[in-house]
């Protein structure tokens, strides 16, 4: 599957998302042979905004303004430390938004004090739909917690399975390596393709959506293999990083077969995190006159 061009609008969190809402009603209203769904991805910088202030209420408001049914989050702290008030950031955001949550830690460290919660950092999925199953897959990583790391399999590639008006959907959330040398990202893309192919074969007919911070721009050679099987739903939208004055598009919604992109945008949210979110309206195309 090649990268396709779509019709897009540049959005502001304050109000322009309504234009997408008119074009694609909430998923609960799906009828006929296609089911509408709004998905988003957001690197939340562990709850800290581009102004250096930790403020979960502000981030919850930014997430709520997206009006998304499913949101992938990166840089999520769960009792990680003082920078996020030792809070379960994934759980706190889910509670504020009234959504289900699945957290997939990349790192899970012993507590500072005996009997305390483990210190964890990773990715998460927020969903308005019940989460039928969840898996934390391993992909190649170069640990930031080791003094002399070597590339090795490590967790933090999250997957949840949902059913949206009868259509099974596999949602994956990822955060690829940030280093200038693309070698680890090359391995991570290969791992991602292998895992998604295996999961697709295990649940025939499931639609697939990949949400994440890829730490590379769309034309980066290491992302090329990914676009053989997935569409970059954000083609034509604006840059996402850094949030205050973005110059790079490194945050993505990518979709597989049976998922049609209806519109996408990068809301002009410049303060709640150091990245801007990406929001996409899709239609889950049914295979026939009945449900899958």
Say what each PLM segment does:
Residues 161, 183, 196-209, 215-292:
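Metal-dependent phosphoester-hydrolase catalytic domains
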Residues 42-45, 73-76, 104-108, 128-129, ...:
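Active-site-proximal beta-strand/loop segments in catalytic clefts of secreted hydrolases
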Residues 48-49, 78-81, 109-112, 179-181, ...:
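Active-site environment of divalent metal-dependent phosphoester hydrolases
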Residues 130-167:
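Active-site catalytic loop in hydrolytic enzyme cores
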Residues 94-97, 118-134, 246-260, 283:
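Conserved beta strand-loop-helix elements of the APE1-like EEP
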Residues 163-185, 190:
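Metal-dependent phosphoester/phosphodiester hydrolase catalytic core
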Residues 6-13, 17-120, 186-190, 285-292:
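N-terminal, active-site-proximal structural segment of metallo-dependent hydrolase catalytic domains
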Residues 37-44, 59-84, 126, 160, ...:
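Active-site beta-strand/loop signature of hydrolases that rely on acidic residues for catalysis
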């Amino acid at each position: 599957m090649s990268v396709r061009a779509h019709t897009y609008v540049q959005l502001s969190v304050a109000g322009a998302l309504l234009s997408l809402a008119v074009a694609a009603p909430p998923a609960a209203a799906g009828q006929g042979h296609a089911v509408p769904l709004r998905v988003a991805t957001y690197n939340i910088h562990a709850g800290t905004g581009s102004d250096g202030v930790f403020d979960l209420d502000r981030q919850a408001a930014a997430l709520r303004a997206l009006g998304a049914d499913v949101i992938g989050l990166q840089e999520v702290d769960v009792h990680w430390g003082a920078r996020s008030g030792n809070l379960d950031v994934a759980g706190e955001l889910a509670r504020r938004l009234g959504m289900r949550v699945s957290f997939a830690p990349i790192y899970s460290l012993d507590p500072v004090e005996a009997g305390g919660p483990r210190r964890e950092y990773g990715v998460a999925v927020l969903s308005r739909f019940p989460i039928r199953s969840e898996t934390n897959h391993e992909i190649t990583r170069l640990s930031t917690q080791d003094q002399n790391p070597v590339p090795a399999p490590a967790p933090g590639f999250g997957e949840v399975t949902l059913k949206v008006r009868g259509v099974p959907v596999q949602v994956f959330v990822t955060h690829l390596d940030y280093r200038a040398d693309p070698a680890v990202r090359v391995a991570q893309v290969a791992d991602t393709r292998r895992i998604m192919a295996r999961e697709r074969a295990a649940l025939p007919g499931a639609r697939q959506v990949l949400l994440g911070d890829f730490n590379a721009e769309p034309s980066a050679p290491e992302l090329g293999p990914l676009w053989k099987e997935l569409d970059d739903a954000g083609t034509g939208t604006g840059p996402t990083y850094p949030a205050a004055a973005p110059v790079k598009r490194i945050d993505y919604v990518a979709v597989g077969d049976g998922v049609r992109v209806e519109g996408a945008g990068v809301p002009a949210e410049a303060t709640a995190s150091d990245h801007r979110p990406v929001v996409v309206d899709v239609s889950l195309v049914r295979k026939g006159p009945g449900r899958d």
